[in-house]
Amino acid sequence: MLLLSKEDIKCVITMKDMIEADKQAFKMVVDGMVDTPLRTVINGKYDGAFLFMPAYAPELDAAAMKVINIFPHNIDNNLMTSPAQTMLIDGKTGYVIAMLDGTYVTQLRTGASSGAAFDLLGKKECKKGAMIGTGGQAAAQLEAMLAARKLEEVKIFDLNEERCKAFAEEMQKGLAKYGAKIIPAKDSDDCIEDADLIITVTPSAKPVFDGTKVKAGATISCVGTYEPHKHELDPAVLPRASKIICDSKEAALSETGDLLIPIAEGIITEEDVLGSLGDVINGKIKGRENDEEIIVYETVGVAAQDLVAAKVIYDKAVEAGKGLRWGE
């Protein structure tokens, strides 16, 4: 079995690689080429939750299981908010062939989901980005946004002003190669003002921005909400949106309050949720048709992403001779 750390993975994969891997995963889901049961969630103490996400793809001769645990208060103790491990299994023998740092893989593939959405649904010419939230997923989300479009500026907002400022400074240095200014915003209104691309990545149970202030032509990726009673997306933006698209329509309509709450309140219907990003890739549904429409992308994550990401990373690591062999 090959053990792959965060540093091993960094050596063999780029964000653009991950965006393409996510596109492959989303296409496989809508093509029926991967078995991805809905995740199992066990709610624990301390506002924590344990998530189990299996997937199997005969075409890849591989299966995967990710265990990811969501503990939002970890950030107060300088701990990761979503520790995880990803297990890659040989589809021919059933042997576990790799164990990957699932926290980092999750950060990459979740960020890449927004990147794939922006690449497929965003305007071709975008100048400004906005991101609300600075937790464990935020850095990869920001990089994916920058990898998808050449931006001049990205504003960051978090309720913790000190953490927001420190994050912006760290990202300005760490993502300097993309050439964008990364600056802290005064508030959420300031953050999303004139933004072409918007990411929300928070554990909030209530909307984190004013949906009436989203500009025409914006693409919004909602990342943080995975429970029916939580909604970080302001429902006010939904009637203004020409399209609502998900990473998985089935999963999103089973899990996220961003959609379930406005559906229950009669603001939108299930039919307003057009489909999955894989349907856009396949041409089954249209993506962006003009530079004025607002498009909302809802991502809850599907196990196919973990499987494809783990397989791509594993193959590249074997080729590059990276990782630690264990039990052989």
What does each of the following model-derived ranges do?
Residues 1-107, 115, 125, 275, ...:
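N-terminal ligand-binding/catalytic initiation module
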Residues 148-174:
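NAD(P)-binding Rossmann-fold cofactor-contacting core
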Residues 134-135:
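Glycine-rich Rossmann-fold phosphate-binding loop(s) that bind the pyrophosphate
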Residues 121-128, 150, 215-216:
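Short helix-loop-beta connector
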Residues 6-8, 230-328:
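Adenosine-phosphate binding glycine-rich loop
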Residues 138-139:
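N-terminal Rossmann-fold NAD(P) dinucleotide-binding loop
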Residues 177-267:
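Rossmann-like adenosine-cofactor binding region
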Residues 129-130, 295:
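Conserved beta-strand elements of the Class I
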